[in-house]
């Protein structure tokens, strides 16, 4: 007789055993899922490793959220800027030359470039391991570090861009300039210095960040998304103020005066990021104002991608001097010079400046 007078039939024993096996199965599968999540093998689709600081893209590529990429890009530019400022204020730059530019000037590099590059690159690479990242400075594998993002999107970004903007990770290329205007940085001309991040999708610039480390001003924008910066209310198209590189202002001045007249003003400045901000409504007293940005020589894509994205998001244009759109895939530089404008007839300006590219090759 069974205990307490209960008699179990063969069918009851079988049901009891099946229930027991079911309980054991669920307990064991839950244990395995927990173990897998610790190694990044579980989690939501497209979410990478579980946990608040895990990658924002799945291990097999998947998709990335451009809104998240913007948040990380802003943080990367600021973190890089902190390194740039710290090195400059220490007055120990460890300055050296990487070689010569096409114009024969020293292509300088400092500790500020290197340390900013490390912070910016690894913050973006840890958050988005599946995307292609191009940066001006060499990334040394021996310096590798994991810099985690807390997955928080700032309120100003959420206010402008309310919903996620997902794109295939394989379509994304990131361009980093860890210290724009290195020459001016070594001369302690701080207002020209910026750190920049750009995200291109299928070669088209879609989001840009330009950060000024010494005034702590940051401009960002996403094409068809939102921005924290805007165009000025008016521009002078007839006799514009033209911002150009300090190294070849004389080349541009001669042609500009012939094109727009003797009232045209040429503003020599350092740094492509600074020059783009000169076209916008920027609340920084050290920032000069211009109506056009012209560049006549070879330039690298990490110098201009962020500015291109910001101008495009605000309805402006950045093209070669012949009016061609710039693709941010393939090689890291462009040969055709540069013309940037906003709230102007850009193609009419292109037609007015037929000889500037030739001027840059003299």
UniProtKB/Swiss-Prot annotation:
Catalytic site positions: 113, 182
GO molecular function, one term: 3'-nucleotidase activity
Pathway(s) annotated for this protein in UniProt: Sulfur metabolism
EC assignment: 3.1.3.7
A Gene Ontology biological process term: skeletal system development
Glycosylation site positions: 262
Bilayer-crossing regions: 13-33
Record topological domains on the Lumenal side: 34-362
Listed GO CC annotations: endomembrane system; trans-Golgi network membrane
Binding site for Mg(2+) 2: 177, 180, 303
Membrane topology: Single-pass type II membrane protein
CDD domains in UniProt: IPPase
PTM annotation (N-acetylmethionine): residues: 1
Protein name as it appears in the record: Golgi-resident adenosine 3',5'-bisphosphate 3'-phosphatase
